[in-house]
Regions:
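Intrinsically disordered, low-complexity segments enriched in serine/threonine/proline/glycine
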Residues: 12-20
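N-terminal and secondary-structure boundary signal
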Residues: 2-3, 19-276
Length: 276
């Protein structure tokens, strides 16, 4: 595959998804200069950014959106002054030295606490994600000392809303939407961008039953393509560049047989989880 570096850096390479060559994938960043406020129309802001970049959405593109702007638009920013910590939150705060109000939010956003240590709380969120601090985050938010951002309540629904609204405004273009967040990983340092909500794309590409290059039949290989797309998008997003939206162009993804797709397909059942 060829990744156009000029597109990652903000260049102006154009072209339909179908005329870039079979082995070319483009990563196209879209900057949003204004801070997102509750009830902001993300579709309008994305279209404005596309116009400023002299770009457009094509059929088969993948629109990757950082959850932070979705959460802000959906009013998922919490004023910590309004949070009253429970006895459990105060107990954990005394042990770990973490703000008890943040702990209260983490517990509210979780259905199970797996463990906590050194200021990190590993939980199973209400969505089913296993992650640190339930995605509760104080970065890239105004007055971060007193505010925190939560994950969208239903990121699949958020992705579908963005997709349908943009399809209506782009003449019915058929593209996918992935909403992302950065998660840590067991046994490896560093975080990676992963999908937390999807629309118009199957999250897994299965090679089960296919033969490898030497004819051996594959039995278990399934690739979480939406996570890999999310990680590719992070190369252009970063954390400081005001690039919360990226277009991935040229990747041939599988569309769902039914109209809807769900991130829940990526969540491993507890009985198959060897790490808990």
């Amino acid at each position: 595959m060829v990744f156009h570096a000029d597109c990652v850096d903000g260049g102006e390479r154009k072209g339909d998804n179908n005329d870039n060559g079979k082995d070319t994938i483009q990563i196209i960043p879209l900057r949003l200069s204004a801070d997102i406020r509750p009830n902001d129309e993300l579709d309008t802001l994305i279209l404005r950014s596309l116009e400023q970049r002299q770009e457009q959405i094509f059929d088969n593109d993948v629109l990757v959106v950082a959850h932070k702007i979705v959460s802000k638009a959906e009013g998922r920013v919490v004023n910590l002054e309004h949070i009253k910590p429970s006895a459990e939150s105060l107990k954990i705060a005394a042990e770990d030295g973490k703000d008890a109000r943040i702990i209260e939010l983490i517990l509210d956003e979780s259905k199970d606490m797996i463990r906590h240590s050194n200021g990190v709380i590993i939980v199973e969120t209400r969505h089913g994600f296993i992650c640190a601090n339930a995605g509760v985050d104080q970065s890239n938010v105004e007055d971060s000392i007193n505010h925190a951002v939560l994950l969208p309540v239903d990121a699949d629904a958020s992705a579908n809303k963005i997709r349908e609204s943009l399809r209506e405004k782009t003449g019915g273009k058929d593209f996918a939407v992935i909403i992302t967040d950065t998660f840590g990983r067991p046994f490896r340092e560093g975080q990676t961008n992963v999908a937390i909500g999807i629309a118009g794309i199957e999250p897994i590409k299965s090679y089960v039953g296919s033969a490898d290059m030497y004819g051996k039949k594959l039995r278990v290989t399934e690739i979480a393509v939406v996570d890999e797309i999310a990680s590719a998008a992070e190369l252009a997003m970063g954390k400081l560049e005001r690039v919360p939206v990226v277009i991935i162009r040229g990747y041939k993804y599988q569309k769902p047989e039914k109209e809807s797709s769900a991130i829940s397909k990526l969540i491993r059942p507890k009985e198959k989880d060897l790490f808990r």
